[in-house]
Amino acid sequence: MKRSLFTAFAAFLALAVVATDYDLNKPFGFCTRSSRTDANSTYNVTGGGCYTYPIPSDFTGKVIVLKSNGEDMKNNIQNAIKQNDVIIFDGSNGDFIVSSNVNVKGDNKTLLGINNARLCTQFHITPEIITALNNAGVPHMNTHEGGGILPNGQRVREEAEFNTRKIIIGLTGDNTESYRKSGILRVAKENIIIRNITFVGPGSIDVGGNDLVSFNGAKHCWVDHCSFSDGMDGNFDITQSSDFNTVSWCTFSYTERSYMHQNTNLIGYSDREPTGFLNTTFAFNWWGPGCVQRMPMIRVGKIHMLNNYFSSTTATNCINPRMNSEVLIEGNYFEKGVRRYYSQNDAISVTWADSNHAEEPNKAGQPISIGTPVTVPYDYSVAPYADVPAAVKKHAGATLKK
């Protein structure tokens, strides 16, 4: 079922730069469904009751506007989310600093950024740390075995992780390794909307640390027009039976701050993830500079990859369907220099549509469809692949304005 849903236009939206008809500016895709097959099983994603700015004058929910105080704001943010329906992050006072993951407590919440709101981890990888890791030869160490016992008594299985953590303990003097908790949001609730926020992590590094943003059992959530960079473990992972979520118009990237493990998006934490969950739509997203793998790597769920843009020339694998996954891949654009953009391992079904476009051949072999054709239970249309680069580069990320 492919009707012209993407030609709709939400004229009421004030917080928007809508110069492309492809941006619906409202929840769509799997987040609006309660079944992976039944189109009549719908869900009304409302968040805290509003996802636009300015807030409508007749809105009766609880709203709070947060500004940075220049210090660790984890508790401030966590309490604001707990006590309010709509949480507005106003970036006019600078970055919001967070020491470790903020747990989103309570269903039916909207988190909305204005004035270039950035949520940043307190810890970050420094040039001194990177130099020490290089001098020790960490990039050439084993990532499967050969570990040891750290000065704090912790046993580590892998050689690269062991030496990385040992070096950071030595440089920082932090035997508790609190830096490994560097992340920003953890969501395990229902009906959550996150829009127009930039999330900045400490830099990717192989220490078994936190993701920048993680969905652990989150359901019916819409993440739209956000930017993710330099997550320690992943930029945005969706696991632990999360279900019916949509990620749209977001950007994923890494900077020189990141060192190893630039694995951006994981769907399903392992092959043991329970089946029947993790149904997710990715539409009009941009996997850009520095991304190496997991764009996304997919286990278990039914995943719709629609009109996404891939430009990372460092990629060793972009879309990677794996155990028990069903994946529909349509209208995506792989830029020149992206030479390893698809492989699959033990997927149930993959539909690789003719509407995808790659500037270069895939070094892992020409993608092909396997299994039963994959369908999704909602209306949509596929934008021409030629429109994708310009539309996504201009409008994806935290680009909405007042």
Enumerate the predicted regions with their spans.
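Extracellular beta-rich repeat passengers
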Residues: 297-402
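Hydrophobic h-region of N-terminal signal peptides that target proteins for export
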Residues: 10-18
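Residues in short coils/turns that link rungs of repeat/solenoid architectures in beta-rich domains
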Residues: 201, 230, 254, 259, ...
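Right-handed parallel beta-helix
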Residues: 95-276
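Low-complexity, polar/charged sequence tracts that form flexible coils or short amphipathic helices
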Residues: 215-216, 228-229, 238-239, 258-259, ...
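Extracellular "leader-to-stem" segments immediately downstream of a signal peptide or signal-anchor
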Residues: 2-4, 19-86, 95, 128-157, ...
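All-beta strand scaffolds that present successive hydrophobic residues in beta-strands
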Residues: 111-113, 168, 192-195, 221-224, ...
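Oxyanion-binding "anion nests"
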Residues: 294
